[in-house]
Amino acid sequence: MMMFITGYDINQKQKKRYGLRG
């Protein structure tokens, strides 16, 4: 579960960094 949360967290950060383009 920790791996899932970590991957999800990174994915969310990438989405925020790239905005709607990501």
UniProtKB/Swiss-Prot annotation:
Keywords: Host membrane, Membrane, Transmembrane, Transmembrane helix. Its main location: host cell. It comes from the Viruses. It is found in: Host membrane. The lineage of its organism: Viruses, Varidnaviria, Bamfordvirae, Nucleocytoviricota, Pokkesviricetes. It comes from African swine fever virus (isolate Pig/Kenya/KEN-50/1950) (ASFV). This is Uncharacterized protein C84L. Belongs to the asfivirus C84L family. The chain crosses the membrane at residues 3-22. One of its GO terms (cellular component) is host cell membrane. It is a single-pass membrane protein.
